[in-house]
């Protein structure tokens, strides 16, 4: 993989300024050829005189068992794979301190081009190109007050020209209280106290299926299937099928996140980190599954319609202690609690409130409520009809489902949220380590 990198220090012009440029070309090729044979298997038997004779068990004759043996090596090729990637970036960095002030800035521009030699379809066989510009600007006063601004200005080939570029800024502030002069009297007990807050945006262009690479272009198959004409359909012609309709409005999936954090150190051995966050994802790509068939559409319709929220807290507790020159103890515990909720969902106006998924967890399961088992066939005949013909498709001893809407039959109208979300809301992890000069106990 050839790579070129150039570093230039520009302190002579502007103190603290430096430039870096790097580019590389990576090519990957793989193929496999195998030569093998199928062995013959023999069975030994003795005649009346005690002489042994061998008989081939898999020679392909009548009564042969297993894979037929071969006397030669066959030749087999696997699928070949060829990929290439071109990558380049340029970085301008500035760091300068004057008095108690420290300022920093970094700007990065990058381009990337990748190509697959055996993509499998037309759209994936085209070169994949992305560009991006990102930056970071920071200010630090006496290691007490810290402000930071980050941004990403990225371009994606997947969207139309007016939707292609996305700007995603992020702001952050932190206050290191333990570095204040008034904090000195309690530093032996509270060795560290820092609060921080961030608020920012992020974008995701890896949405939908890989086959739907260019949402703003129609995908038309000019040779979908053959249709016959004439006597006995003896004359055939290829037909045209639409696999995707062009959509100029599909764009980046966006997320907005706010974080509040606390860093607390006690006795220089114990450290507690607490982070509380809230994230809202919008423009989530979703299939429009509730479009009437009378519109005559042949391909599925997708749009940036859905919206979801997640929030939670992350807690980390670390303990590090040295006993003398040889003993050492370390402990770490983490706890995460997170919940999610659907805010906007592409669904029709139901009469039954229980059918809506808005307000439920992103991993909430929906289904039928199983009340109990039918006592006997008589109860089957006197209960709401469910999934077939009573007394024939289900009998006494089968599961009895609840008629939620009371219409006398079990249908999709009776599906409700059941059980807990499939994604755990709480997780914990604990580790410890005790080390002596000769032993390590975990």
Task: Report each predicted region and the residues it spans.
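Short loop/turn motifs that connect adjacent beta-strands in outer-membrane beta-barrel proteins
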Residues: 9-19, 32-34, 97-103, 144, ...
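Outer-membrane beta-barrel transmembrane strand signature
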Residues: 1-8, 68-72, 77-79, 90-93, ...
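Transmembrane beta-strands of outer-membrane beta-barrel pores
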Residues: 23-31, 109-117, 151-157, 177-179, ...
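Conserved small/polar residues in nucleotide/adenosyl-binding loops
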Residues: 430-436
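Solvent-exposed loop/turn elements at secondary-structure boundaries
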Residues: 118, 184-254, 271-308
């Amino acid at each position: 993989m050839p790579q070129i990198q150039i570093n230039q220090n520009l302190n002579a012009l502007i103190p603290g300024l430096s430039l870096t440029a790097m580019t590389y070309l990576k090519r990957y090729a793989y193929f496999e050829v195998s030569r093998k044979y199928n062995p013959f298997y023999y069975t030994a038997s003795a005649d009346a005189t005690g002489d042994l004779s061998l008989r081939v068990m898999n020679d392909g004759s009548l009564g042969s068992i297993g894979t037929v043996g071969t006397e030669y090596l066959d030749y087999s090729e696997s699928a070949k794979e060829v990929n290439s990637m071109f990558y380049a970036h340029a970085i301008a960095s500035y760091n300068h301190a004057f008095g108690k002030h420290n300022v920093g800035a970094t700007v990065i521009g990058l381009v990337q081009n990748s190509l697959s030699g055996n993509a499998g379809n037309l759209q994936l066989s085209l070169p994949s190109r992305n560009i991006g510009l990102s930056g970071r600007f920071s200010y630090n006063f006496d290691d007490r007050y810290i402000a930071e601004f980050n941004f990403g200005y990225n371009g994606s080939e997947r969207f139309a020209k007016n939707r292609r570029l996305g700007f995603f800024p992020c702001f952050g502030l932190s206050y290191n209280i333990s570095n204040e002069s008034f904090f000195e009297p309690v530093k032996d007990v509270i060795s560290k106290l820092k609060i921080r807050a961030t608020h920012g945006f992020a974008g995701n262009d890896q949405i939908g299926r890989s086959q739907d690479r260019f949402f703003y272009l129609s995908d038309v198959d000019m040779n979908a299937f053959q249709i016959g004409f004439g006597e006995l359909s003896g004359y055939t012609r290829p037909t045209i099928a639409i696999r995707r309709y062009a959509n100029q409005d599909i764009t980046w999936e966006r997320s907005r996140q706010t974080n509040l954090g606390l860093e607390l150190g006690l006795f220089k051995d114990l450290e507690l980190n607490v982070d509380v966050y809230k994230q809202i994802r919008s423009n989530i790509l979703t299939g429009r599954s509730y479009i009437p068939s009378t519109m005559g559409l042949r391909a599925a319709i997708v749009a940036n319609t859905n919206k979801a929220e997640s929030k939670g807290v992350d807690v980390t507790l670390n303990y590090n202690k040295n006993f003398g020159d040889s003993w050492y103890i370390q402990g770490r515990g983490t706890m995460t609690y997170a919940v999610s909720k659907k805010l906007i969902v592409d669904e029709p106006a139901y009469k039954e409130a229980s059918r809506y998924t808005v307000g439920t967890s992103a991993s909430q399961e929906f289904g039928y409520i199983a009340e109990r088992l039918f006592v006997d066939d008589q109860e089957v005949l006197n209960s709401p009809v469910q999934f077939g013909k009573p007394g024939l498709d289900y009998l006494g001893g089968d599961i009895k489902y609840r008629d939620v809407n009371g219409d006398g039959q079990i249908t999709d109208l009776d599906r409700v949220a059941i059980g807990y979300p499939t994604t755990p809301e709480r997780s914990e992890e604990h580790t410890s380590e005790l080390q002596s000069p000769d032993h390590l106990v975990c």
